[in-house]
Amino acid sequence: EEPTALIMRVHRSNFKLVGFTEEPELKDMVAAAHAAGVPVVDDLGSGALYNTEKYGITHEPTVQESMQAGADIICFSGDKLLGGPQAGIIIGKAELIAKIKKHPLARAVRADKTCLAGLSATLLHYLKDEAEREVPIVKMMSLTLEQVRGRAEAWAAELGHGTVVAGESTVGGGSLPDESIPTFLLELEVKSADKFLRALRKNNPPIIARTENDK
């Protein structure tokens, strides 16, 4: 038999498993793997750098928690909950990163300068503790309900059309399945919601909306 090369944990970032289910803690996986001389790879998916519970959302494993648990390699996205450009990030032990860099595919999937510049700018906001002010996804999640209501009411007053109603929003990118946060919406009644939605998206700049019950 071939020896085990590694143990990998893949976080369920875009679906939920419900019912009578159990899974080991990452730290226990690391302890068992390291006792056998096997590295552990932790694929976090969205790669949050902050506690999502702060914004009223179920806890999402963070990069820091994975590091503290002792994972040898950690993979996560540069976009989604982190809020930077679309990218795949790999961090971990220097000797393992060096092996990954030597793989023939590494050159084909490496990030370009534009992506690296955007990612660097995003991470700097976290280092400066200004993500809630400068990183769009974090900024949006940190808004209070009253702030969202105020925006919707101001927009309705400016347009002279529409009704402000309570609703629910989801965190994008498949990051938090079956999770929603309370919000306020500007509801517009139009002849064809689908046609109006397409027109909004083709606008310059595009306006991203959604349809519910032909509104």
What are these regions (language model features)?
Residues 23, 51, 93, 136, ...:
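Serine/threonine-rich low-complexity intrinsically disordered regions
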Residues 95, 103-104, 111-159, 167-168, ...:
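Structural motif of enzymes handling amino- and sulfur-group chemistry
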Residues 3, 24, 39, 104, ...:
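Proline-rich intrinsically disordered, low-complexity coils
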Residues 145, 149-215:
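Conserved C-terminal alpha-helix-loop-beta "cap" of PLP-dependent enzymes
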Residues 1-125, 159:
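Conserved PLP-enzyme active-site core in the AAT-like
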Residues 73, 107, 126-130, 162, ...:
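Short secondary-structure junctions and interdomain/linker hinges
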Residues 9-12, 107-110, 133, 149-151, ...:
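Arginine residue identity/basic-tract feature
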